[in-house]
């Protein structure tokens, strides 16, 4: 079998064009790039269907570079999830500055929707089941934290109104549960505006269907 030199050159050129060019980066820049690529892949395909090889290929580096930064796929996934959890929790925590109960709850809801809007891949990632080896940093654990915070807010409001504060956890579960489901729905439709969604969700839980 005779292979012409011109054919070999053409094939090599084609393969070179298909590979993303390797850009020289600092260690921190490369790490940030790998995290962003992995976040997109994990959000689209989940943990099991994402490979270190594909992350490396999209970044234009070899697999050892990924292992050098994260130790493996599990380590990479843990870093990505931890960053998304931190981003969401920071947004929620910073919204808890209003001393009035209802506006404070509404700003928490709006903070979640803002995260969904600005970090869509991150939210999709958090909604996916984490591998068994990574027990922390799951969306369910975040929801539990949110229930605890909202329960504390509602308990204070119930006491002020002369209502039984022991019922606050029940209402907190209902509020956070409805907000969580609505956020997952809004993730795809993006209508109406997040401010309108937040206002209606809080009004529904605060006043019921009569208002």
Describe each model-derived feature in a short phrase.
Residues 1-29, 158, 165:
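N-terminal intrinsically disordered/low-complexity leader segments
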Residues 31-32, 52, 74, 78, ...:
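Short, structured helix-loop boundary elements
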Residues 33, 37, 41-75, 79:
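Helix-turn-helix
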Residues 75, 107, 114-152, 159-165, ...:
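Short secondary-structure transition hinges
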Residues 79, 93-118, 172, 198:
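Hydrophobic alpha-helical connector segments
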Residues 86-89, 135-160, 169-173, 196-199, ...:
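Amphipathic alpha-helical packing segments from all-alpha helical-bundle domains
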Residues 115-118, 152, 156, 172-192, ...:
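Amphipathic C-terminal alpha-helical segment
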